[in-house]
Structure formats: C-alpha cells, structure tokens
C-alpha cells in the first residue's frame, strides 16, 4: 500500500484476489458491487462514477465469473506495467463498443490513429489541455502517452474536459483514472454551448472531435453570446459554433487540433 502522484487507492474489499475468490459463486455480483462502492469511498475522483448493478437478477453470474477468470488466467503483469496494460484493455473495449454501435459509437470514441495525429501535430508538452466534446477521453490519454514518449512530465499538464452524455462522461472519468491522469470534467455532464463547465478557462491546447452538423443545438437562445467573436453561427448547423467555442477557450499563442466535417469553413448550411 502506498500513496503517489496520480494513483488511486484500492481498499481491501475491492482488491482483485477477493473478487477472483468469489468469481465462481452466486455472490459474485454482490462482491463486485461492494468493490465498486469501496473504490468510490476511498477515491473522491471516482465518486458517483462506477457502475454498481452487477447483483441485479437479470445479469448472468456465470458469465460474469467467466469474464473474471479470463482476466485472471490470461493477463499477467507486474505492478509497474499494470496501468499500461489495463489502459490498453480499456481502450480496446471502447473501440469494440464503438464498432458495435456503428455511427452512434463515434459520439464517444475517436479512432486512436486520428487522435495520435492530432496530438503529434499540436504537441501538448505542458500547460492546460481542453476537449469540449471529450467522449471517453481519448485525446487526454494520447496526450499523456506523447509526453511519456518524449520523456516529459505528466504533472506539467492540466486536463479539462466536458461531455454531454452522462454515461460517456463516466467512461471518460474511469478511463483517465485507470491511466493515472488527473482531470477536471466539471461536476456533471453538460452541454458545452448552454452549460459551459469551464467558462473562464483559457487553454494552451484545445483538441476535439465534436459531433458533425448538429442542426438542433439551440443557437437561437445564444445569439448574443460573447463566444461568437467571428459572427453568429447559423441556427441550423453547430459546426461554426464549435470552432468559435474552442477559439474562445484558447489562450494567446495556444494551438487547436480538431476534426470537423468537410466544408465546415465554407458551408452556408443552416443559415
């Protein structure tokens, strides 16, 4: 047991050996739920984030136990490499979930090759990093990997994110906790346009893959918003609003890396 930077504490009731011992019993769901509750109690950054519904009757406890056995019997790593392995496993499952969801999956997951390209271009070595449509937090994870590859100090960055979907907001919190990255995602999920969680933030790096061509984004309620420094965005398309929102939160001499639909800079759609 120890305390260190960017480490969350795993209490006795949440430790892997206790979960494994119960994996083939009918009580495995109760044990996993208790583990989640214990983790949240000891780690304030996880409070209200972890799922605690594994004891529900409709969940097949044998299948849950089999999944635990797969991890126990096939993933072997030391403490020093555990975080990296768990992070890659989590990223793999996020990618699989996104593929299963099809187009909808793109709302919470950006392919790692796209994220790596953005990170390599803007090079977020140190400073404040912001993603106003952060999904599951992939931009931040790749930023931390970039810093590690270049022998930088992860403690020299501050991470800020916002996500509209409450379930995806929780995924991002878990993703960054697993990877040992401290982050400020606001006190809840929220709409970046109508409920800006970081209204005074000026970030050194802004990275995002916001949803394309959103037509119903409530632009008619924000016509006098101070973020629209380059003109009022069309009410029928949020692309220009996303760009201005990011520019508004960009510090002097900051850098932006974003993914938007073709023609976002020239389209008259929605005017």
Language-model region placement:
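Conserved S-adenosyl-L-methionine
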Residues: 104-208, 213-217, 222-224, 229, ...
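Non-catalytic, mostly N-terminal accessory regions of nucleic-acid modification and defense proteins
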Residues: 1-125, 184-197
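Short amphipathic alpha-helical segments, especially helix-boundary/capping motifs
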Residues: 41-47, 63-67, 90-95, 147-152, ...
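Phosphate-binding glycine-rich loops and adjacent basic patches that engage nucleotide phosphates
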Residues: 26-34, 46-56, 75-84, 130-138, ...
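Conserved Class I SAM-dependent methyltransferase catalytic core
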Residues: 118, 169, 187, 234-271
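Helical mechanochemical/support elements of P-loop NTPase systems and associated helical scaffolds
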Residues: 63, 85, 89, 110, ...
């Amino acid at each position: 047991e120890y305390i260190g930077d960017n480490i969350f504490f795993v209490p006795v009731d949440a430790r892997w050996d206790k979960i494994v011992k119960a994996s083939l019993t009918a009580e495995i769901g109760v044990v996993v739920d208790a583990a989640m509750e214990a983790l949240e109690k000891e780690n304030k950054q996880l409070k209200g984030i972890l799922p605690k519904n594994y004891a529900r009757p409709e969940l097949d406890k044998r299948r849950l136990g089999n999944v635990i056995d797969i991890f126990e019997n096939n993933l072997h790593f030391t403490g020093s490499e555990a975080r990296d392995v768990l992070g890659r496993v989590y990223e793999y499952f996020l990618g699989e979930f996104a593929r299963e969801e099809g187009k909808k999956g793109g709302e919470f997951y950006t392919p790692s090759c796209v994220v790596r390209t953005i990170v390599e271009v803007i090079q977020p070595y140190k400073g404040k990093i912001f993603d106003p449509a952060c999904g599951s937090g992939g931009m931040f994870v790749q930023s931390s990997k970039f810093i590690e590859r270049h022998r930088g100090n992860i403690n020299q960055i501050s991470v800020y994110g916002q996500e509209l979907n409450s379930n995806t907001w929780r995924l991002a919190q878990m993703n960054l906790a697993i990877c040992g990255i401290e982050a400020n995602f606001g006190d809840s999920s929220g709409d970046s346009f109508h409920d800006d969680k970081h209204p005074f933030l000026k970030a050194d790096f802004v990275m995002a893959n916001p949803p394309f061509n959103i037509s119903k984004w409530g632009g008619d309620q924000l016509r006098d918003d101070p973020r629209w420094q380059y003109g009022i965005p069309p009410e029928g398309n949020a692309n220009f609003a996303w760009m201005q929102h990011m520019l508004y939160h960009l510090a002097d001499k900051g850098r932006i890396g974003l993914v938007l639909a073709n023609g976002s800079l020239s389209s008259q759609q929605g005017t």
